[in-house]
Amino acid sequence: GKEDVIVTIEPKILNIQGILHAKVADLPRVLLYNTANAPHQGELTPYDFRGEEFLTVAGEDNDYVTDLIRSVCKPYGFTPKIQPVHSTDAMIMGVQCGLGVAVTDSWSRALDTPGFAYLPLESTHPLSLVWRNEHRDPAIRRFVTILKKTIHNA
């Protein structure tokens, strides 16, 4: 089949020739951790997790992801230890098993997992819709507008 519109958080797709895009939201990033492995009781900050492994999904853009995680942690005064894993599921399982923490976004399904908690971070990433340039369907523009309003009001 042919997709009319794709929802993505992948920034590289926005630069593909023949693709149009619209940002619909900025998703807040969070630091996901296992409550059983919290560094201490009470109020936590990202700095409290400086000794943890930061699990990230490895791939061809591993340098980009590593730099991204480092830039997210820099305002908190530390450089994270990065531990690549092969998939998002492996990253979540790693957090669940106490192997480290993960930077994800506020829409992650893992946030509702019993035994997990998260800290809001001073960082966001864009959620975008993309479609082929040849699709000049006004319904796509209307969909973008409706989706932006829906997300904003959620």
Residue ranges and their predicted role:
Residues 80, 98-106:
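A generic "structured core" feature
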Residues 66-67, 87-89:
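Conserved glycosyltransferase catalytic-site signature
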Residues 78-87:
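Short beta-strand-to-loop elements that line the ligand-binding cleft
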Residues 16-54, 138-141:
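Flexible hinge/capping segments at coil-to-helix
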Residues 117-154:
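A late-sequence structural motif
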Residues 9-12, 35, 105-108, 133:
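Short secondary-structure boundary segments
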Residues 52-76, 141:
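Secondary-structure junction motif
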Residues 1-29, 33, 91, 96-99, ...:
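Short beta-strand-centered segments that line the small-molecule binding cleft or hinge
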